[in-house]
Amino acid sequence: MAFRKENKIKSNFSKITIGLASPEEILENSSGEVLKPETINYRTYKPERDGLFCERIFGPIKDYECHCGKYKRIRYKGIVCDRCGVEVTEKKVRRERMGHIHLVVPVAHIWYFRSLPNKIGYLLGLPTKKLDSIIYYERYVVIQPGCVDTVGELDLLSEEEYLDILDSLPRENQLLEDTDPNKFIAKIGAEAVYDLLARLDLDSLSYELRHRANTDTSQQRKNEALKRLQVVESFRASRGRNKPEWMIMKVIPVIPPELRPLVPLDGGRFATSDLNDLYRRVIIRNNRLKRLIDIKAPEVILRNEKRMLQEAVDSLFDNSRKSSAVKTDANRPLKSLSDSLKGKQGRFRQNLLGKRVDYSARSVIVVGPELKMHECGLPKNMAAELYKPFVIRKLIECGIVKTVKSAKKIVDRKEPVVWDILEYVMKGHPVLLNRAPTLHRLGIQAFQPKLIEGKAIQLHPLACTAFNADFDGDQMAVHLPLGNEAVLEAQMLMLASHNILNPANGAPITVPSQDMVLGLYYITKLRKGTQGEGLTFYGPEEATIAYNEKKLDIHAPIHVYVEDLDENGNLVKTMVETSVGRLMVNEFVPKEIGYVNEVLGKKSLRDIIGRVIKACGVARTAQFLDDIKNLGYYMAFKGGLSFNLADVLIPPEKDELVQKGYDEVEQIMANYNMGFITNNERYNQIIDTWTHVNSNLSNILIKQLTADNDGFNSIYMMMDSGARGSKEQIRQLSGMRGLMAKPQKSGAEGGQIIENPILSNFKEGLSVLEYFISTHGARKGLADTALKTADAGYLTRRLVDVSHDVIVNEEDCGTLRGLVCTELKNNEEVIASLYERILGRVSVHDVIHPITGEVIVRSGEEIREDAAKAIQDSPIESVEIRSVLTCESKKGVCAKCYGRNLATNRMVQKGEVVGVIAAQSIGEPGTQLTLRTFHVGGIASNIATENSITSKYDGILEIDELRAVEAVDEVSGKKHLVVVSRLAEMRIVDPNTKIVLLTHNIPYGSKLFFNNGDSIKKGDVIIEWDPFNAVIVSEVSGKIEFESLVENVTYKVESDETTGLKEKIIIESKDKTKAPAAHIVDENGNYLKNYSLPLGAHVVKDNGDVVKAGEVLVKIPRAVGKAGDITGGLPRVTELFEARNPSNPAVVSEIDGEVGFGKIKRGNREITVTSKLGEVKKYMVPLSKQLLVQENDYIRAGMPLSDGATTPSDILAIKGPTAVQEYIVNEVQDVYRLQGVKINDKHFEVIVRQMMRKVEVVDPGDTRFLEQQIVDKLEVMDENDRIWGKKVVTDPGDSQTLQAGQIVTARKLRDENSMLKRRDLKLVEVRDAIPATANQILQGITRAALQTNSFMSAASFQETTKVLNEAAINGKVDRLEGLKENVICGHLIPAGTGQREFDKLIVGAKDEFDRIFANRKNVVDFNAMDKDDEE
């Protein structure tokens, strides 16, 4: 496919077009016809002439040597031998010269009639079955009925019918010209299809189909027409580039022989590429057919042979598509041309995107604690081999040897002189280290190598986190950057000491771990009652002297004068209480951040490193990290911090707690046996009991460990510092192992918990049964991990594929839109603070402090740390920030919308590949997510339910949408309101500034103790409600009557275990006509209100009871929302990114309105929503679902009517694009947060932006789009701009140039009409052009990746043949804008240092530039020349 310019391949092309090849093009690219199926002469091993490996066609096998040996050596280059016809040239031309095969009969290309959608079938309007019967020579097709009126065009005829018609025709009919409309023409095979395609008039077909799509009433026919239109339009769009008849081939190309090699094995056998077999079958059948035609064989035999030729060509192009694939002797299907492109082993992924490189090595890694942050240790032999060319050059330069060959020998012999030169060559020439799997960009970093003895690579211990490496036998690969630019990039951008921050969240990633943390924790911990406690020293030096003289313990609390920062950030001397250990640490801490006086655990270390980076920059941080690394290791060794069995303390209270647990369980079992509680409740209560025992034991245990040895218990120190181990693990060592999950068959059925806990811990040892139960979980864990890794890897791949072309392409796109950002809360607990969410983003508006009125941030400015802190501390609740979701860049995104680059803490630069970084940041922690679906069961999850709203502020209460009835508390006799509206919302407002301090929804049925407009004091309880039950409250007073309440049909009676009261519980009735309901009537029996009773409701009142307004009629236990399984972890992330609909979706209201209940039909209840304007929507909700609304409730659009998860497509349709974007971002964030993984929002936003790129055309208007077509947002905008202000001709009048339906500019129309007017002819009539309207759609990442503008990127992702197939017909052009396309073409990626604007730069020395600049009069001005050209 390379451009052949004098046989040179141009590599600086800027786009690639794909299309169908015409027979002429195939011949033009071919170097000769392959006539024989022979490959190689088995005796001479030379290619046969005119065969598949022929030298005359494809070029010589040996460099500059013809077949017969008449011409040898380079001096005959370019001569064509007169005896054997071989051109004398290099042998590598056999990699690029193509041949061809002339087929006797045309053959259909399998891609275009066997794949869906069936392209040839759609063009001709034939179903696949019929088309197959024509192509495979079973039926004749009528191409032109002529004078025969019994058949029509495209009718299929059997052979008998065909012959009958021929017989009935007059003799001279067959002698007519083919163009004569009276001639009857019917043909068979691909030839017939060729004729049909060649006769198509695409323009009129397009017009006819458009008309049909617009006017047809039947939806099915309309869809059919639209499908056909798409194919027709794609051929029309690629005008001249593609003709439909080229889907039928008369010539097929033969790929170059070196790409389908034939290798002789020992023993006279050959290993051959499958393609050779496939080509051979085509040639044999083609030649046999030629001969049969020459000897005038009977039609039957010919037809069979033609069919076999069609099948042979089919299997050559795509063997896997056929039902009867051609197999080898070993019963393995042969690999056809399509198979060599597909899949992981195909051309795209194996050879174009992932190549093996030279100058690389790999070895085991060991720890290098004495290395600097930017260094690694490289074994001598490895280095000598890697740097060989550089060493050789230096040896020759220094005059040690004269030739390259002798220099090589010296290096191979490893003579002493080599090592000195190697040292010299390695200076300033870093190597890249890579550990597989490379999950994010920190998996490859550059280091300055140091020569070491041995055979293992030494790695800096702080770089382990980024590589996810440990030293239990991990291996790493070394690569050597060769070019100057590569070396420079490795040093400036990839050096390990420059990559201290994690691009996923901006936190330091090179944080000391394990031993280092332990050592630092140990020396910074204070201990009372040690030698020298309470002494005061003048300065750190004195204290150190006292320590060295053994007069002072390292943990002793002492007072010292040190330099620390005051409020204004200036260094001053102050007295602090500290210890010698902390003084040691502070020797290394940069002065800019003051005196660090705290116990150093992993968390606090991370914060300190973050502060150091901000204050002192990267270089100083690297220095600081190395210093504390050394101190940490040294002190861990000095402290002798190991642990023994006696450090594992078992709390003495354990037996008592376990006994108590057994007693409770016995009580629960007794209740169950007496029938007070159901089996499910019993199970939940038992699980609950043991969970409590376990957590109580853990708390006692941790308390005890903390007290042990003044907190210097080794195990406790390891846990507390964050070096190793967790509370969970310590609990298992010395508490009890607790409850275990039952092994489940598949990930789908959430794991039940075994109700007998493991009471032993590891110190006491487990019994056989306990061991058996626990070993099961452990093994399953290992199996899960293996599966999970593959899943996470696949997720990353899809994410990269969808986002790789998101590059920062401009500074500012100038959009006025943004996202409103607030802090995220879950039940009043702040999950993500406003500070975290707005830091490093750009504000849309000026942010003004509401009380002081000062401007904190100007619009279009980055919100830096101090500004974010100021906003957080002020009463501002939300800030509108720029986001990639609202960015309006045409290509990629702009820097302002993206904000800060988290890896550098500065605004993102042009050319940063934010898409790939986002994909890696989300994919990399994927392996830490769980695979299982969480089981939420029992009371365990409902412990901390809030049941009231207490004011945290003084202020004034405002309430919206309130409907309430007064009621009196039976116990205290106080009055309160009972809320009966579902949309009530309360706000507390600051009385002076009117700023909203707190907003909250008021739950239905809650008690309200204040009125609208009341003053509230801090700590007042405003509202309270029953946290365990949803209720139905009577809104009026009256008598209650029940309908359809029949014992054991619609309800059953159960007794409450605590009170012994009997309750009626509504059950699902077999009799679907009965719908239980409660009516409230007045004395005269008039209905006042009725309430429908949902499943599982506990009816509190009896028939005929008198109720007061505000009394509870029905309780619906909340826990009835069954112990459901939440899809968690990786499957949930995949579900969201793929925009899949959940298994039990909620029914959602599309409008604001009042709820009404309709009839029950077929197990579904009809619910109507009526808006204030009278619009009515009907929804069918299955009876098995719990309803979330009552009759007469007023609800808002987007609110669910039934339980279940809301589908993303519903949110998009009802609440719009912004809502669905935020929904996906927040939902995915929740999954990661649950695992304690921090990822910045902007990464998710980048992916979601890519999911929302396309729109679906609803009404194409006068544009070139089709209905239901899916197109880029920008394309629709551009097309609408193009036809804006133009006119559509409705009646061309007497105009010669215009036709009906043509789109013209107003000016052209004016000229035309004035001309017609002058001649007194009929004028042209027009209407305004109508623009297209389109709906935003949400695509899953896989679909979005396949729909990119670049066909090469899509083809290398998935469904390769389908993508190429579509692209070829559309004559698509790939403009090489993303990363993948450029990698495939072997170009630099258009990002970072490969940005296209750098292509014009010339890099040179400074003095050179100064010299040119001084004599610049003589220098040609390139810019001026460019301008002239443009003019």
Swiss-Prot record:
Catalytic activity: RNA(n) + a ribonucleoside 5'-triphosphate = RNA(n+1) + diphosphate
Residues given in the record as Zn(2+) 2 binding sites: C813, C887, C894, C897
Domain of life: Bacteria
Presence of the UniProt keyword Metal-binding in the record: yes
GO function terms (MF aspect): DNA binding; DNA-directed RNA polymerase activity; magnesium ion binding; zinc ion binding
GO biological process, one term: DNA-templated transcription
Cysteine pairings via disulfide bonds: none
Cofactor needs: Mg(2+); Zn(2+)
Binding locations of Zn(2+) 1: C66, C68, C81, C84
Keywords noted in UniProt: DNA-directed RNA polymerase, Magnesium, Metal-binding, Nucleotidyltransferase, Transcription, Transferase, Zinc
Top-rank EC class of the record's enzyme: transferase
Assembly and oligomerization: The RNAP catalytic core consists of 2 alpha, 1 beta, 1 beta' and 1 omega subunit. When a sigma factor is associated with the core the holoenzyme is formed, which can initiate transcription.
Protein name: DNA-directed RNA polymerase subunit beta'
Encoding gene, per UniProt annotation: rpoC
